[in-house]
């Protein structure tokens, strides 16, 4: 029976799109889903027209706007809070990142308590843990592995602090006498259809057909398909709705994982770009030189910020992320709430390859005719 009302903040983004689609496909109790975002994309409007069984309500709003948020969460059962600024290139100021990611999260918690929301699932990130600014490796870690999470950059620090705030809110009594159930999910390096990072890499390499990697071949990263991240969110919310404060998820954190291979970041991406005849090359520059360039880029970004937006992909933070092994090996989500990846690695790869081919076809059709 369809009785539940979900709200997904940041629902028009990359991961939000996967969560909305999978909610509609696999959550049999879903009656209504409200997609709360600062913009409403055409794909969502198309989905509203096509979907007759479930009510889809687009809501334009900012998580920093408490009154709009309160209205969007009225009578909601579950909130999946994705909305955040995920910026590693320096496009946004540190103050903006902290304001949206921390104060926005506090507003979401307050609105949940004001409206008597039963379940709040927070989309955190592995960046809340690391890599830290020292570049310390995490090798086959899990949720219980000790790691010195010292952050200097605004994004990972904001996710770390927001995650802490979400977990501390678990069990708080709402205005209507219900205790709020909260958990945090940490996706690893997410890939899949509509991934903005993969699209950026494609567009920057479209003409040259060359991609470059900076890190040693022995530097590995864990990756996870967006559809499986979405599935874990759905299972987590379902378990907390069914079990309330007795759910093992309450006040708990989980890495989002699947069976995707653990490889070098760019070697992994070539599973999708090889089909286009793209070539992956090692940079000839030594690490000390890359660090120098990264710091120069950071300085230029600050100097040029009053007159233009200079956001090179290579900066001290992105260099540390690429050059630091960060791998996770866990089955905590399976043990606690029965999570098994919905999509195999082969299916995940195939879906992503198809989307990349669609990007290629679109780019080719827009080429000026000679």
Swiss-Prot record:
SUPFAM superfamilies linked: NAD(P)-binding Rossmann-fold domains
Gene3D superfamilies for this protein: NAD(P)-binding Rossmann-like Domain (3.40.50.720)
Pfam families: 3Beta_HSD
Binding site for NAD(+): 159
InterPro entries for this protein: 3Beta_OHSteriod_DH/Estase (IPR002225), NAD(P)-bd_dom_sf (IPR036291), NAD(P)_dehydrat-like (IPR050425)
EC number of this enzyme: 1.1.1.145, 5.3.3.1
Gene Ontology terms for molecular function: 3-beta-hydroxy-Delta5-steroid dehydrogenase (NAD+) activity; steroid Delta-isomerase activity
Reactions performed catalytically: a 3beta-hydroxy-Delta(5)-steroid + NAD(+) = a 3-oxo-Delta(5)-steroid + NADH + H(+); a 3-oxo-Delta(5)-steroid = a 3-oxo-Delta(4)-steroid
Pathway membership: Lipid metabolism; steroid biosynthesis
GO BP annotation list: steroid biosynthetic process
Key words of the record: Isomerase, Multifunctional enzyme, NAD, Oxidoreductase, Steroidogenesis
Active site per the UniProt annotation: 155 (proton acceptor)
Domain of life: Viruses
Statement: the UniProt record of this protein carries the keyword NAD: yes
Function (record text): 3-beta-HSD is a bifunctional enzyme, that catalyzes the oxidative conversion of Delta(5)-ene-3-beta-hydroxy steroid, and the oxidative conversion of ketosteroids. The 3-beta-HSD enzymatic system plays a crucial role in the biosynthesis of all classes of hormonal steroids.
Family recorded in the similarity comment: Belongs to the 3-beta-HSD family.
PANTHER family in alphabetical order: 3 BETA-HYDROXYSTEROID DEHYDROGENASE TYPE 7 (PTHR10366:SF847), NAD DEPENDENT EPIMERASE/DEHYDRATASE (PTHR10366)
Protein name: 3 beta-hydroxysteroid dehydrogenase/Delta 5-->4-isomerase
């Amino acid at each position: 029976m369809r009785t539940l009302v979900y709200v997904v903040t940041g629902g028009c983004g990359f991961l939000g799109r996967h969560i909305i689609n999978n909610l509609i496909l696999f959550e049999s109790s879903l009656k209504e889903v409200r997609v709360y975002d600062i913009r409403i994309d055409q794909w969502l409007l198309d989905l509203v027209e096509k979907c007759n069984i479930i009510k889809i309500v687009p809501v334009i709003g900012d998580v920093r706007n408490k009154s709009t948020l309160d209205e969007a969460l009225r009578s909601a059962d579950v909130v999946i809070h994705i909305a955040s600024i995920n910026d590693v290139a320096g496009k946004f100021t540190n103050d903006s990142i902290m304001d949206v990611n921390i104060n926005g999260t506090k507003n979401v918690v307050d609105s949940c308590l004001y409206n008597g929301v039963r379940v709040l699932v927070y989309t955190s990130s592995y960046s809340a843990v690391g890599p830290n600014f020292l570049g310390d490796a995490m090798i086959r870690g899990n949720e219980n592995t000790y790691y010195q999470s010292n952050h200097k950059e605004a994004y990972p620090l904001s996710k770390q602090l927001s995650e802490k705030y979400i977990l501390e809110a678990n069990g708080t009594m709402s205005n209507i006498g219900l205790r709020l159930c909260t958990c945090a999910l940490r996706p690893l390096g997410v890939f899949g259809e509509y991934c903005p990072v993969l699209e950026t890499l494609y567009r920057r390499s479209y003409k040259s057909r060359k991609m470059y990697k900076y890190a040693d071949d022995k530097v590995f990263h864990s990756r996870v398909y967006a559809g499986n991240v979405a599935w874990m969110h759905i299972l987590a919310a379902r378990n907390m709705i069914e079990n309330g404060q007795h759910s093992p998820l309450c006040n708990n954190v989980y890495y989002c994982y699947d069976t995707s291979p653990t490889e070098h970041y760019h070697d992994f991406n070539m599973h999708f770009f090889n089909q286009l005849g793209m070539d992956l090359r090692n940079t000839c520059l030594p690490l000390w030189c890359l660090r120098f360039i990264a710091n120069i880029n950071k300085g230029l970004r600050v100097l040029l910020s009053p007159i233009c937006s200079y956001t090179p992909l290579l900066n001290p933070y992105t260099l540390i992320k690429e050059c630091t092994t960060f791998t996770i090996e866990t089955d905590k989500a399976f043990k606690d709430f029965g999570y098994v990846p919905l999509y195999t690695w082969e299916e995940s790869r195939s879906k992503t390859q198809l989307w990349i081919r669609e990007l290629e076809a679109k780019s080719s059709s827009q080429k000026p005719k000679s």
